[in-house]
Amino acid sequence: MASNDKGLEEIPEGQIESNYDEITDSFDSMELKPELLRGIYAYGFERPSAIQQRAILPIIKGNDVIAQAQSGTGKTATFSISALQKLDPNVKGCQALILAPTRELAQQIQKVVVAIGDFMNIECHACIGGTNVREDMKALQEGPQVVVGTPGRVQDMIQRRVLRTDNLKMFILDEADEMLSRGFTEQIYDIFQLLPQSTQVVLLSATMPQDVLEVTTKFMRDPVRILVKKQELTLEGIKQFYIAVEKEEWKLDTLSDLYETVTITQAVIFCNTRRKVDWLTDKLTARDFTVSAMHGDMEQAQRDVIMKEFRSGSSRVLIATDLLARGIDVQQVSLVINYDLPANRENYIHRIGRGGRFGRKGVAINFVTADDVRMMREIEQFYSTQIEEMPMNVADLI
């Protein structure tokens, strides 16, 4: 960790310049602990994704690392594998601290760490708001080697001296742009002040606005910078279609017709507002479709139940807002429907990058009114992709 103020002006707005281009194209050649390697393969990974090929080794070597990459590229596994490689399972106490912007994402990261570290005898605790403080304190006192959490609760636990940082080796900020844009700047700066000077810092972010760059300049020492460009992100394997809908109010019938045509194993339907999510859920339920809904207004416990039902397959269709696009990671989703096109093009990949990550096939269907055509063209241009009119035989493709 470092404190300096130079170097900020060198970086073009919104994007970092890579200063590292070594690629390691297999997990076997990363010299990982055998029990970690076993966990990686057991989790279902075969070969590293673009970001994993570039970022895992410099992190393991102890460099501060800034990685710019979108969701759906394998970021979580990148820092999970790196942290697990550097941990000493025999030492109790937090050795890797991971911050995430939302509770969902923190819990998802915890699941990945636990799954990949399955053969390593390590503990990972999710330290998040909306849970019982006493239970949190009890879990932390047992000395889990990895703690993943949201900034407010983590800061609180460090200040109470329940989350000890004496053994801390690595501090990881995931989706840094999201954390700062949600107003966690002060907590994050406070956490930095409470950590040992020698802590290695790893920062991951989809975009690089000024406030993220300031964090990197203030708190990172000669960081390795890795940019995974858009074209390395995968819309590959995802068939993208649009259905032209003349009027907004006809979308509901269009969706019902689609339901009739297609056997949906699992689908996520995205709307742009919480109100629309509730409205659509009511309408579909009234038409005897079984759907669940999830948005930011809901209590945490309620969201957990919905997510659990969806992951286990007992609920087949989830209607959600963009807020949760980054926190939903359901491997078996075969279909994503954009009932509303996203309000900004960056969110398009967060939404549909779900359906076919890492070569899993998926289908995305966009409902497009006359007002949406321009946005759809922008999305096509931005991702150098084609969104074609939905064919009659769409059922065969899903």
Swiss-Prot record:
A motif (DEAD box) lies at residues 174-177. One of its GO terms (biological process) is cytoplasmic translational initiation. One of its GO terms (molecular function) is RNA binding. Residues 56-226 form the Helicase ATP-binding domain. Residues 237-398 form the Helicase C-terminal domain. It is found in: Cytoplasm. Gene3D superfamilies: P-loop containing nucleotide triphosphate hydrolases (3.40.50.300). ATP binds at residues 69-76. A motif (Q motif) lies at residues 25-53. It is an enzyme of class 3 (hydrolase). Belongs to the DEAD box helicase family. eIF4A subfamily. Component of the eIF4F complex, which composition varies with external and internal environmental conditions. It is composed of at least eIF4A, eIF4E and eIF4G. The Q motif is unique to and characteristic of the DEAD box family of RNA helicases and controls ATP binding and hydrolysis. This is ATP-dependent RNA helicase eIF4A.
